[in-house]
Each structure stands twice: as C-alpha cells, then as structure tokens.
Regions:
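A structural signal for hydrophobic alpha-helical transmembrane segments in multi-pass membrane proteins
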Residues: 10, 14-35
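Short, hydrophobic transmembrane alpha-helix segments
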Residues: 26-41, 62-65, 94, 211-213
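Extracellular loop-to-transmembrane helix junctions
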Residues: 36-52
C-alpha cells in the first residue's frame, strides 16, 4: 500500500505566512533604489539575509516532513519560533551595523530552538539524522553567538554568515543519512510550493502599492514578470516531480532557492 502523504496543519500554514511576510519586509527594507537603480551591494545583502531565513525555514520543514512531528511540543516550538522570526524581520535595517545585535541574536535563538527540537527527537527515536542535524544547528548557534563579540563589524558578519552557510549546505554532505530517512515528497513539495505561492502574493501586493500611487510601465512589466514566473513554477511543480520516489529530497530543497 502506498504511503499516504502527511497533511499540512494550520500551525504550519501560519508559520509559512509569517516567513513570507518576513521575506517581503526584508525586500522592502533593503531594496531602496539609488538614482532609480538597486545597488549591487544591496542585492548581495538581500541574498545573504534570504539565506538566513531559508536555512531556518528548511530545517523546520525537514523536521516535520521526516518525523511527522505534529504534537503539542512541536506546535509550542513553532509558535515560539514564529515570534523570533518576526523579531528577526523587524530587526533588518539598510544600515547593517545597526542590525547586528538584534538580527544575529534572533538567528542564534532560532537555530538553538531547532537544535533542541532535533535533540528531543534523537532522544525519543534514536535517529541518526536528528542527532546530526541537532549537533549541526547547535554548532551554528554557537558560532553566531561568538560572532556577536567579534570586531570589526565586517569580520563579525563574515563569521555569522559563514556559520549560516555551513548549516545551509550541511544536508548536501549528509545525503546518505537523509536517504536512510526518506522524505515524504508529497508533503515536502507542498510546503515549499505554499511558501513560494505566499511570496508571489507578497510580490503582487508590492506591485499593487505602486499602482495605487500611479500607473507606470515599470509596474506593469514587473507584474507580468511575476505572473510568468508563477506560471513557469506551476508547470514545473505539476509535471517535473515524481512524488512516489523515496529520495533524500535534496532536489526539492535546493532547487526551490533560486
């Protein structure tokens, strides 16, 4: 009998909505045009910040997908993480030096929270995946906390993003461990598609705000690009994935990032 897919809970949908809001707010805060152009430095900063949010969200989603952790404890952790995601998003400032303490401290707390969830699962289920991810996330949280006390500021941020990048790439190095606990591709792809859909919605809202201020060719073209990207994504989602496979799910995880 084929394994039935997990259903997405209301708490998870709420969590995804908060993340979509955070990504949208981050884009609005950092994408401040200078002479009608977005500076390359701002684009790099946006991508680095996006990596932080994506890594946190991915580890939470992998935990739910692998272990079907729909319990009171999991819901409490999720609600706790929601609060810190909001703090993380409101801490973003175009002047990164002012962002350092609230942003990096919030990220450290979130990684430590995720490490605790994986640690509890390891104690209960003795899963090698839960143990490895728990240690990885705890180490990342420690590196982020250390980065808070490093000077100058540029070196502090380099250490911070180095820790986040190492955590984000860790699943690629643990392919065999992930295969030992196969992904529920139906659930995993649904979660990612819902988040992408919410982010597309945030983009449309951003266009609507500019249209309200006055119609422009630029706003119309941006709206068209968003719609075309959405259609392309839907075609790939509907036709490019065999959800019956038992895989590590790495393709679903990493191909969603671009």
């Amino acid at each position: 009998m084929a394994k039935s897919h997990q259903s997405v809970t209301m708490v998870e949908l709420f969590y995804d909505l908060i993340f979509a809001y955070a990504v949208g707010r981050m884009a609005q805060t950092l994408a401040v045009p200078v002479h009608g152009m977005i500076a390359p430095q701002v684009l790099v900063e946006f991508l680095l910040m996006l990596l932080v949010f994506w890594t946190i969200w991915t580890f939470q989603t992998v935990l739910i997908d692998r272990f079907s952790h729909h319990e009171v404890t999991h819901n409490l952790f999720t609600l706790f993480n929601m609060f810190w995601v909001i703090v993380l998003s409101t801490a973003i400032n175009p002047d990164f030096a002012k962002t350092k303490w609230p942003f990096q401290l919030s990220a450290a707390i979130l990684f430590l929270s995720l490490a605790s969830q994986y640690g509890l699962l390891w104690r209960r289920k003795h899963s090698q995946l839960a143990k490895t991810f728990g240690i990885t996330l705890a180490a990342c949280s420690f590196v982020i906390l250390i980065s808070l006390f490093i000077k100058p500021y540029t070196l502090s941020f380099a250490v911070f993003f180095g820790g986040v990048l190492a955590a984000g790439l860790m699943p690629l190095l643990l392919r065999n461990v992930l295969k030992a606990t196969p992904a529920d591709l139906g659930n995993l792809s649904t979660r990612y598609s819902l988040l992408v859909l919410l982010i597309f919605g945030e983009s449309i809202i951003g266009v609507a705000e500019t249209i309200y201020a006055g119609l422009s060719l630029q706003a119309g073209l941006f709206f068209l690009v968003v719609i075309l990207l959405f259609i392309a994504y839907q075609l790939v989602y509907d036709n490019g994935l065999d959800r019956r496979q038992k895989t590590a799910g790495l393709a679903v995880i990493y191909l969603q990032l671009p």
